Amino acid sequence: MVFTDTSIYSMQFVGPPDTFGITIVSEGISIRSPNSAVAIEDNVFWMGNNEFYVYNGAVQKIPCTLRDFVFSDFNNLQAEKVFAGVNSSFSEIWWFYPSADSNEVDKYVIYNYQQQIWYYGSLNRTAWLDRGVNELPISASTDFYLYNHETGDDDGSTNPVSAGRNCHILLIPYLLPYAVISS
């Protein structure tokens, strides 16, 4: 896949004399930044200017319950900092982006492509690498640290949890585990 600011092309090996053949896949399609697309399982996912897309033989908009939430709190002057990552252990595509009040990436939105649900949160990250080279996903931050993801224990408290599917959004402010003790 080759992205421009308004179109997507497919580039395939065709052999000599041309070596590669280029065909247009879709016109009138945007991509938020050069790093906002990722490929997994024969699909390419990306964040456009106001939509999320997947290419799986054809370009399709991904229904997103958090679309307005993400794009209404977005710093367009820092759009080139948007990047995508894959967490293949959980069938997730992560997009990291700067919120309206930030000049650095401080928010994320996740799409679980197996369950077709969305989640979001706040996290300062500048790069992401899925497991493969390492046992776990690893990311970088503006504090000059590398972080292992999907490891360790909780920090003793819960974060707000939200999930969306099609036109329904679920917000759970806190999760409180409890035990039933009986004699």
Predicted stretch roles:
Residues 1-26:
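Surface-exposed extracellular loop regions of Gram-negative outer-membrane beta-barrel proteins
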Residues 26-183:
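Beta-sheet repeat architectures centered on beta-propellers
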